[in-house]
Amino acid sequence: MKKVLLVDDEPSIVTLLAFNLEKDGYEVTTATDGAEGYRLAISNPFDFIILDLMLPSMDGMDICKRLRQEKFDTPIMILTAKDDELEKIIGLELGADDYMTKPFSPREVLARMKAILRRTNKAVPAEPVATAQPEPTEDETEK
């Protein structure tokens, strides 16, 4: 089972993402402030990190930068309300593997995470995130 560290200080986002990740078979560890997230990241083997930027005690950019300076190669996705182009560029240059902005779709987070994991040494099999079929049109339901 793949292990994901989710670092975000918004309880509703933590609940939503943890639910969807666990439903998809991931083991999720959560942290609600930057210092706790950093401590967990360096002391536990995670396959993936989802990281907010605006966190109490240590911001996400600092966490990402420090992890990369210390040669941690765990894939990192920044998930934040900061949608400024410069913030995105800085986050990616500091070592994030992806940068998504809030609001977000949990299905898209999962799809992006799986794509990154497939291309790293943390490989997972390619499985569709959504298997839902389109709703039948009125013409199809009358047949």
Where are the language model's segments positioned?
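Short, Lys/Arg-enriched segments at the junction into DNA-binding effector domains
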Residues: K3, L117-K143
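Charged docking surfaces used in two-component/phosphorelay signaling
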Residues: T15-K23
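Acidic catalytic/metal-coordinating carboxylates
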Residues: D33-E36, D59-D62
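Short hydrophobic/Thr-rich beta-strand motif most characteristic of the beta2 strand and flanking loop
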Residues: G25-D33, L40
